[in-house]
Amino acid sequence: MKIGVITDCFGFGLPVATAIERAAALGFDGVQIYATTGSFSPDALDAEAIKSYRELLNSKGLEVSALCGDMGGHGFQIAEDNPARIEMTNRIVDLACEFGAKVVTTHIGVIPSDKNDPTYKVMLDALTACGKYAKSRGVTLAIETGPETADVLYGFIQDTEGGVGVNLDPANFVMVTGQDPVSAVKLLGKHIVHTHVKDGVMLKRTDPKIIYDHFATGGIEALNVADFFKEVPVGTGDVDFPAYIAALKEAGYDGYLTIERETGADPEADIVLARDTIKKLAF
């Protein structure tokens, strides 16, 4: 396995080039970069900029573990929004190819547990289209775990026509659904193509759809997500990392463990803590 870090974890708004340099200085193997908007989006990068970033990454000995193609909102739940979202996803897949990245990660919205729900077909049609294109380019579109349990996600992926996999975030399971990440790895194993290293605790159980609707639109007035879960430094929350890493190894996973730290007073210190914790377990 290899260890990576999301560039935005060094500070939202920090130039991507600076974050790449920080990642190299801390001894990471690769970086995951947000590519939907901002300076690393398809709209922002011309051929010369792509060449410049490739040269920087090569000079620092870094790979691009994945691009993040998350577009926010309700993901692929709204049919009339999907043509534009599919087009953007395909452009991000093309951008991933420019950097030799084999994975594009994204949140897709809340997958209904009932396959007869009309939203299920809307999402399936969109992800099938995205998956076909990604597969044609040698890339996997990796759905980030979050609002649904592993069995629902597994069934959904099985219903696509390839090119769709999993970006497994263990903290999202423990914080939102309450599912043990180890059991999720055992079920999703063959579909896992990228992972996040993140820890957290659930403070109060609720319907995950309520949480993700809040993320998408601002949700229910006065809803405070901090009442329901909390992201914490790796090793201090409810993710059993020794068991989780062991499960990944047993499943044959040999890809990236990419650190994601979205909060905290000193994110870089937490990034180093996560790196050191994972190194002891993965190697």
Question: What is the role of each PLM region?
Answer:
Residues 6-10, 34-36, 69-72, 109-111, ...:
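Active-site beta-loop-alpha junctions enriched in small/polar residues
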Residues 67, 125-238, 280:
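Acidic/histidine-rich catalytic cores of soluble enzymes
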Residues 236-250:
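A short, acidic, amphipathic alpha-helical segment used as a generic capping/interface helix at domain edges
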